[in-house]
Amino acid sequence: MQNILVVEDDYDQNQAICYSLKKSGYGVYGVTFMEKGKQTFIENQIDLILLDVNLPDGEGFSFCQWVKKQREVPVIYLTARDMEEDALAGYESGAEDYVTKPFSMKILLRKIDVILKRTASANHRIFTDEN
């Protein structure tokens, strides 16, 4: 089972996203603070992160940069910040995608599926090439 970390400070939205992900067969960790997200990331095998930009204890951009220094894990931003410079900052921080709210859960689930399949395929090629 692939595990997704949801870092979203709006509790109701966090719960709704987590519910949809669980229903789609993913293992899910939902947190509302960046520091709790870091702790959860360190303690668990996380395969993808859904990340808000505006968090009570910091900006998602710095969290994404921190994650990328730990190991390569795909990050998708989910945010109300729809300015071009925010999206560019999101990609520059290392994210695979930048999705603005409101969003379609069906489309988000498809994006997650595509990214996880691409990541698994790349990891398989690396493993095969090394042996």
Features from the language model and the residues they span:
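CheY-like receiver
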Residues: 119-131
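N-terminal/domain-start alpha-helical segments
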Residues: 1-119
